[in-house]
Amino acid sequence: MNLHEYQAKQLFARYGLPAPVGYACTTPREAEEAASKIGAGPWGVKCQVHAGGRGKAGGVKVVNSKEDIRAFAENWLGKRLVTYQTDANGQPVNQILVEAATDIAKELYLGAVVDRSSRRVVFMASTEGGVEIEKVAEETPHLIHKVALDPLTGPMPYQGRELAFKLGLEGKLVQQFTKIFMGLATIFLERDLALIEINPLVITKQGDLICLDGKLGADGNALFRQPDLREMRDQSQEDPREAQAAQWELNYVALDGNIGCMVNGAGLAMGTMDIVKLHGGEPANFLDVGGGATKERVTEAFKIILSDDKVKAVLVNIFGGIVRCDLIADGIIGAVAEVGVNVPVVVRLEGNNAELGAKKLADSGLNIIAAKGLTDAAQQVVAAVEGK
């Protein structure tokens, strides 16, 4: 679950980290009033969406008058911002952040993620701030410096100083950087985060460090113990189908293809998508109904898949272990009866109660294409899409 920049900076303030004074505004009038609270200009105005590349898309601007602030707010509030990280529809701009402009001398990068290979939280820092860190990692990886947090000791000040020296910082900037490093590490661990990015972390012309931007990603599986973060969720920034799936504890990710996939188990779901691609198809989604699937959840999963107008066929691939294949069959039958299906449905059932599930589907009178194996299922669903 991602947070908006203004929400990230609210957290920074709670942990004593330096960030510009700013206010999130939902109307042009609020934006003008925010400027008055901040004081004399110039001011930075930023569209609040869960996507990078806002500046290049016109969603970030430095202005010198309250009239310009009002014009920016009137232009963007209620509109959709399209960046290189969004689809063609963009994301809705419901708030803009008005904050004091910063005199920038140099831009740095500081971020943290969970490194799956080392199973530790890893901090990354670079002198190449203000640009996409992925591009830096690809073209000049030697400019990214890393330290891993020991799960027993947690973050240590010497690690912050080590990164500061590698960035070429001196004097009081080393102390300031170390404080920011320790604060971000504390936020990451205490708030069950999956991602922190300060891009850019800037050195001002006055010689101080300040978090000019902030991107936080929370671990969705840990939100039950982070009620305040859960309240910050902005579902308007999410794919409606993904939000609906989350309410039913379904793991759904929308993709750009035309073959809907319903699978139990994340590994099997990824393998199913791979084999569909191998045979010339394009998955429309990743959907894992999980190990504790019920008839109701399977019905909802089917409805979510069919709500995508791009879907021209559906592949159901179930390996019955914890999930019984006959329950999956009941869910498919229920979904078809409730929603109606105008696209081919290919079903592959293996394992626990597979024969009973297949019999239920056969006796239902529905137009279901039974597959004899995973390869056969992929070939049949691709052929169905192509009209063969």
From Swiss-Prot:
Q: In which pathway does it act?
A: Carbohydrate metabolism; tricarboxylic acid cycle; succinate from succinyl-CoA (ligase route): step 1/1
* Binding residue positions for ATP: 46, 53-55, 99, 102, 107
Cite the binding residues for Mg(2+): 199, 213
InterPro entries tied to this protein:
ATP-grasp, ATP-grasp_succ-CoA_synth-type, ATP_grasp_subdomain_1, Succ-CoA_synthase_bsu_CS, SUCC_ACL_C, Succ_CoA_ligase-like_bsu, Succinyl-CoA_synth-like
Q: Which reaction does it catalyse?
A: succinate + ATP + CoA = succinyl-CoA + ADP + phosphate; GTP + succinate + CoA = succinyl-CoA + GDP + phosphate
What binding details are noted for the cofactor?
Binds 1 Mg(2+) ion per subunit.
Q: Which GO terms describe its cellular component?
A: cytosol; succinate-CoA ligase complex
Q: Where, in this chain's numbering, is substrate bound?
A: 264, 321-323
Give UniProt keywords alphabetically: ATP-binding, Ligase, Magnesium, Metal-binding, Nucleotide-binding, Tricarboxylic acid cycle
Q: Which GO MF term does the entry hold, naming one?
A: succinate-CoA ligase (GDP-forming) activity
Task: Give residue ranges for domain ATP-grasp.
Answer: 9-244
User: Which EC number(s) does UniProt give?
Assistant: 6.2.1.5
One Pfam family this sequence matches: ATP-grasp_2
* UniProt cofactor(s): Mg(2+)
- GO biological process: what's one of them? tricarboxylic acid cycle
Task: Spell out the subunit comment.
Answer: Heterotetramer of two alpha and two beta subunits.
Family membership noted in the UniProt record: Belongs to the succinate/malate CoA ligase beta subunit family.
What NCBIfam families does its record include? Answer: PRK00696.1, sucCoAbeta
Its biological purpose:
Succinyl-CoA synthetase functions in the citric acid cycle (TCA), coupling the hydrolysis of succinyl-CoA to the synthesis of either ATP or GTP and thus represents the only step of substrate-level phosphorylation in the TCA. The beta subunit provides nucleotide specificity of the enzyme and binds the substrate succinate, while the binding sites for coenzyme A and phosphate are found in the alpha subunit.
Query: In its UniProt entry, what is this protein called?
Result: Succinate--CoA ligase [ADP-forming] subunit beta
Q: Which gene encodes it?
A: sucC
